[in-house]
């Protein structure tokens, strides 16, 4: 990953990338992140898998705009004029395309006494928890 970012940095910016770049599977709504404290970059592998190398390269350019402007002591945030100009110059993406959402599986529970229905992402220990309305016994329903 770091080698690819170094290559893009030299080809598109004419400057070296001297730090590290990593894949980060926990990223959901963003294509990448720049960390000013230690100057490393994180990238979302889902963007690469779903949209391919062309879109991913534009996201790498976007994060490298943050990186190089920070190193030069210029405005590196999205609202700064220097950032917007450099991003347009290197043909980086302003916004990340939406990744298709992963379907979340829910667990359904109902109360035996009052019939109250609960929907939860995480499983509930049926021996430990009861209905919040009538304190009746919960059962798993499908």
From Swiss-Prot:
The keyword Zinc applies. It holds the Pfam family SprT-like. GO terms for molecular function: zinc ion binding. The active site is at residue 63. Zn(2+) binds at residues 62, 66. Its cofactor is Zn(2+). It is found in: Cytoplasm. Residues 4-138 form the SprT-like domain. One of its GO terms (cellular component) is cytoplasm. Belongs to the SprT family. This is Protein SprT-like. It comes from Streptococcus agalactiae serotype V (strain ATCC BAA-611 / 2603 V/R). The lineage of its organism: Bacteria, Bacillati, Bacillota, Bacilli, Lactobacillales.
């Amino acid at each position: 990953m770091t080698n690819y970012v170094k290559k893009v940095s030299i080809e598109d910016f004419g400057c070296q990338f001297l730090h590290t770049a990593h894949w980060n599977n926990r990223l959901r709504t963003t294509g990448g992140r720049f960390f000013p404290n230690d100057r490393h970059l994180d990238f979302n592998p889902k963007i690469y898998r779903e949209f391919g190398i062309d879109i991913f390269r534009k996201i790498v350019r976007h994060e490298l705009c943050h990186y190089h402007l920070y190193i030069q002591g210029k405005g590196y945030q999205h609202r700064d004029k220097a950032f917007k100009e450099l991003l347009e110059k290197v043909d980086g993406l302003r916004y990340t395309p939406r990744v298709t959402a992963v379907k979340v599986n829910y667990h359904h529970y109902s109360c035996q006494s009052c019939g109250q229905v609960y929907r939860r992402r995480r499983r509930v220990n049926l021996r430990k928890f009861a209905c919040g309305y009538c304190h009746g016994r919960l059962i798993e329903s499908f």
